């Protein structure tokens, strides 16, 4: 019996660009991560990271992103302490060993 052929990748280096990063999860979102404050995810950029989080922690994306898929207004993402709003947004590239912090904004007077 012949096994079915595997699909060919149009870009064989695609998987080489995916990096393992550490994600710091704020307490209000830890119900999606079974109480874990940090998790490791594989992604090439912040947008892919959000998708990876959703795949592993169903329901978390609705808390992270608005209906258009953009990060929620009062939620900040930092890559190695750099705010992604001042980098490339969700297209911000990730490297192996990066630390991504998800930080709810604090308001008040």
Curated annotation (Swiss-Prot):
GO biological process, one term: Mo-molybdopterin cofactor biosynthetic process
Cellular component terms (Gene Ontology): molybdopterin adenylyltransferase complex
Pfam family membership, one: ThiS
Superkingdom of source: Bacteria
Alphabetized SUPFAM superfamilies for the sequence: MoaD/ThiS
Signal sequence, renumbered to the chain: none
Family the UniProt entry places it in: Belongs to the sulfur carrier protein CysO family.
Name of this chain's protein: Putative sulfur carrier protein slr0821
């Amino acid at each position: 019996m012949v096994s079915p052929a595997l699909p060919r990748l149009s870009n064989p280096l695609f998987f080489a660009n995916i990096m393992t990063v550490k994600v710091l999860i704020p307490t209000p979102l830890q119900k999606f991560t079974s109480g874990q404050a940090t998790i490791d995810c594989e992604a090439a950029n912040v947008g892919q990271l959000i998708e990876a989080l959703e795949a592993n922690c169903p329901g978390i994306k609705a808390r992270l992103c608005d209906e258009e898929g953009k990060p929620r207004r009062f939620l900040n993402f930092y890559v190695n302490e750099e705010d992604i709003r001042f980098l490339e947004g969700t297209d911000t590239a990730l490297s192996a060993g990066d630390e991504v912090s998800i930080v709810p904004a604090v308001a008040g007077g």
